[in-house]
Amino acid sequence: ILNDVIWNKKNPMPNFRGTRFTNAHETLIWASKSEKSKYTFNYQSLKCLNDDLQMRSNWELPICNGSERLKKNGKKVHSTQKPEALLHRILLATSNKDDLILDPFLGSGTTATVAKKLGRNYYGIEKEKNYFKAAEQRLRKVKPIEDDYLDTLQNGRSKPRIPFGSLVELGIIKPGTTIFDNKKKISAKIMVD
């Protein structure tokens, strides 16, 4: 075991019967096959998510609700659907772009959804047809996150920025030049003050 992580649910479901404590947390186990096994830990990426502080092993995240919650005919598709924020943190911490993520209990497809957004490859296994269909529909709608954002997260730091005015001062960009965004949809003409 490399770590155990406590997911403290900010908004846990109450125990309406009053027969036990409210399930307000879940324990995640991060393990490797052996002490000599290689594993990924993106320390800087987690610092980037945590105001440049080392990530702790107790995470305060809400349960899945609102528009993220999959519903069919007004009812939850899956009773224990995990929030994307939880899987985002897990996959960002323990994998890299183009890695393969396996979820042997696909459920509503949260792990695969986040893997696709983060540029990871994924396999999901699910025996319940209703869950599988819901996950499949969900995954069709997912768009990967922009590479610039992923690079910043993966490297833990933003690329150095150069003041635009210095590009003109150094003659790299000439006044009167028209520049475009990478999709050629937005343009701007360089003017001198």
Which residues are covered by each model-predicted region?
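Core catalytic lobe of class I
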Residues: 1-134
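PRPP-dependent phosphoribosyltransferase catalytic core
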Residues: 133-193
